[in-house]
A protein has these predicted regions:
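N-terminal, intrinsically disordered, polar/charged segments of Gram-positive cell-envelope systems
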Residues: 24-68
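Charged, often glycine-rich, active-site loop that binds/positions anionic groups
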Residues: 112-127
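Glycine-enriched alpha-helix->loop->beta-strand junction motifs that scaffold or abut catalytic
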Residues: 15, 146-148, 177-179, 237-243
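Low-complexity, Gly/Ser/Thr/Pro-rich intrinsically disordered linker/tail segments
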Residues: 267-283
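Metal-dependent polysaccharide deacetylase catalytic core of the NodB/CE4 family, i.e.
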Residues: 66, 71-79, 122-124, 132-136, ...
Length: 283
């Protein structure tokens, strides 16, 4: 063959070889491409999750007035009218679950009342006053089992008292996601009998303790025995609270005084019909 023809054939072979190499990716190239796709998918999922966490209320809808039954419990045990036995508490939590109620966190309740927005029609806020030990040993397992959430109104000066929750208990329960904590003052005194300065100390100190130890912004104060006066409301605001819980009966609404929210007391021996009435009626 002529030298020019040989050079042409060789050149054509090299070109075809290079073209084949470009079209058939090596295993390493395929693996890198696969890893890149997975990373991209993870990035999209992570971004969507972050956006959801950054905007937790994006799917809530606006209403003219929020009607929020706030259930009031204390000890989950037997003994007196402030104690609801665990068996009855479980029946009531099961009722909420089977009837499609959404139990709000304290932050969600504050948001709902302040912005008049709700996630669904059937909502309820469960509160347990006085931070009794049985809130952890009796109520908490039931709440987890029925997938409900509750707020414990915590007496910050009682952490070393018998039959009350410790800080370690509170941290453990908070981490579960079923429980949050709001303030019930430091010493559980009748606020309306105290001077303004002592009231302010009780309110401010308990909020600072909860904020620091539980790494949160405590927005709600629950009045001990429901007792408060106009000076208390002034102290609430100065201490940095957004809402306050009383013991006056009734379903809370977004048009109520935010520093005097009504609650529905759950008592032992209550029938499910009576319990249902607490969720739907002010009577």
């Amino acid at each position: 063959m002529h030298m020019r023809g040989i050079n042409f054939v060789l050149g054509l072979g090299v070109a075809l070889g290079l073209l084949a190499g470009c079209q058939a990716a090596s295993p390493a190239t395929k693996q890198a491409s696969s890893q890149s796709s997975k990373t991209s998918a993870k990035s999209v999922h992570s971004s969507a999750k972050h956006q959801s966490q950054a905007r937790p209320y994006q799917h809530w809808h606006t209403v003219k007035d929020v009607h929020l039954p706030i259930l009031m419990y204390h000890s989950i045990s037997s003994g007196n009218q402030l104690r609801v036995p665990a068996k009855e508490f479980k029946t009531e939590m099961t009722y909420l679950k089977t009837h499609g109620y959404r139990t709000l966190t304290a932050n969600e309740a504050v948001y709902a009342l302040k912005h008049r927005r709700i996630p669904q029609k059937k909502i309820v806020w469960i509160t347990l006053d006085d931070s009794y030990k049985d809130n952890m040993t009796a109520a908490w397992p039931i709440l987890k089992q029925t997938h409900q959430h509750a707020t414990i109104n915590f007496i910050t000066g009682f952490t070393h008292k018998k039959n009350h929750l410790t800080l370690a208990d509170a941290k453990r329960m908070q981490a579960s996601g079923n429980i949050d904590f709001q303030s019930h003052t430091v010493r559980h005194l009748d606020l309306n009998n105290l001077t303004y300065q002592v009231q302010l100390t009780e309110l401010s100190s308990s909020k600072k303790w909860l904020d620091h130890n539980l790494q949160q912004n405590t927005q709600v104060i629950c009045y001990p025995a429901g007792r408060a006066n106009q000076q208390t409301i002034k102290a609430d605001k100065q201490a940095g609270y957004q809402y306050a819980l009383s013991t006056a009966p009734g379903i809370a609404t977004s048009t109520q005084n935010p520093y005097n929210l009504t609650r529905q007391r759950v008592v032992p021996g209550m029938s499910l019909t009576a319990f249902q009435t607490l969720l739907t009626s002010n009577n």
